[in-house]
Amino acid sequence: MDIKNMRNVIVSLSLVFGLLFTVSGIIEIIIGLYSILGFKIELPLFVGDVFGGLALLAVGIAYFLGVKKAVDRDIKAVSYLFTASIIGLGIGVIAFLILISDAIGFLLGFEDWADWGFFNDLTVYLVLGMLAIIPYRIAKIISSSTT
């Protein structure tokens, strides 16, 4: 399988996930900035972390750079898809570890976690991190079939 034949797949995946990560990052940054200014905005899945939003934005930009490479028919397009997916997975793993640690605190009966629930830790980081498995697996298949 040649990278030129997979161009549409790479462009589509990179565009979709680039938009998901970029829009989520921008929303996260906006909510975080408003909370710094004293305004409280609550959206499901979003916690208002400015630096987390910047991380999501960086992953989205990496996906978009992959789109540019794929449109130019450059073999490096798979690398951008692969790298952005790995970073997205890393963000998801960190969110999952936070969920696990909070669950342990709840199960051990710690006072700070008395009112904890699973949906308290279900964040955009966890959702996007788990979704990043899709382009990761596809990029892995593409890279193994082009060698």
Swiss-Prot record:
The keyword Transmembrane applies. It is found in: Cell membrane. Its main location: membrane. It is a multi-pass membrane protein. One of its GO terms (cellular component) is plasma membrane. Keywords: Cell membrane, Membrane, Transmembrane, Transmembrane helix. The chain crosses the membrane at residues 13-33, 45-65, 80-100, 116-136. The keyword Membrane applies. This is Uncharacterized protein MJ0565. It comes from Methanocaldococcus jannaschii (strain ATCC 43067 / DSM 2661 / JAL-1 / JCM 10045 / NBRC 100440) (Methanococcus jannaschii).
